[in-house]
Amino acid sequence: MTARPLAELVDPGWADALGPVADQVTKMGEFLREENSSGRGYLPSGANVLRAFTYPLADVRVLIVGQDPYPTPGHAMGLSFSVAADVRPVPRSLGNIFDEYQSDLGLPKPANGDLTPWSEQGVMLLNRVLTVRPGNPASHRGKGWEIVTECAIRALVARDAPLVAILWGRDAATLKPMLGPSVPTIESVHPSPLSASRGFFGSKPFSRANELLVGLGAQPVDWRLP
């Protein structure tokens, strides 16, 4: 991740919203450069670390929270659960998300695992921890990213604009108090193969999110993926 000012790396709305933690973002950049210089490296690539914040803050209407990036080199691309279009096969958690997408919406299975069209629709795909050491899941937890992403979530809530949060798994569920009573939430177990059969399948998160958005007076999301 480059040492450029935050305003050059993210959407202007997000640059303002993350102003209180700009110094923390700088510290995280220093941490990542140390990871590289030590030979440990990090994922996703530097240009994609803040990718979730390059889409307009003002447009966000659904928040989907992930834990941390995929640790497999070539998979993480800066949006939670998403992978680059050329990744085959898709990670199993994403495959389960696609199974539920098909069941819930009656749409065909997407051709690839790139969820960028959702981001362009105002769906924020945010990992609580924005980086990971290759091959080492959760290796950057507690290093400081949580300060940044919790500031982001508070900024979303403070807008007083329609917002629905989709919380998959225990880690995401701990954010519910931060969202407050005004943000409707859709909760289930994580789509991981270890838990998906215990309540993720059949939870209909996509159609339910649209029902809640309409109830808030907002436009529903067009969830279709190519």
UniProtKB/Swiss-Prot annotation:
GO cellular component term, pick one: cytoplasm
Keywords assigned by UniProt, alphabetized: Cytoplasm, DNA damage, DNA repair, Hydrolase
Enzyme class: hydrolase
GO molecular function: uracil DNA N-glycosylase activity
Single GO BP term: base-excision repair, AP site formation via deaminated base removal
EC number from the UniProt entry: 3.2.2.27
Subcellular location: Cytoplasm
InterPro entries hit by this protein: UDG_fam1 (IPR002043), Ura-DNA_Glyclase_AS (IPR018085), Uracil-DNA_glycosylase-like (IPR005122), Uracil-DNA_glycosylase-like_sf (IPR036895)
Superkingdom field: Bacteria
Enzymatic reactions: Hydrolyzes single-stranded DNA or mismatched double-stranded DNA and polynucleotides, releasing free uracil
Active site annotation, chain numbering: 68
Annotated function: Excises uracil residues from the DNA which can arise as a result of misincorporation of dUMP residues by DNA polymerase or due to deamination of cytosine.
Xref: NCBIfam families: PRK05254.1-1, PRK05254.1-5, ung
Family (UniProt): Belongs to the uracil-DNA glycosylase (UDG) superfamily. UNG family.
Protein name: Uracil-DNA glycosylase
Organism: Mycobacteroides abscessus (strain ATCC 19977 / DSM 44196 / CCUG 20993 / CIP 104536 / JCM 13569 / NCTC 13031 / TMC 1543 / L948)
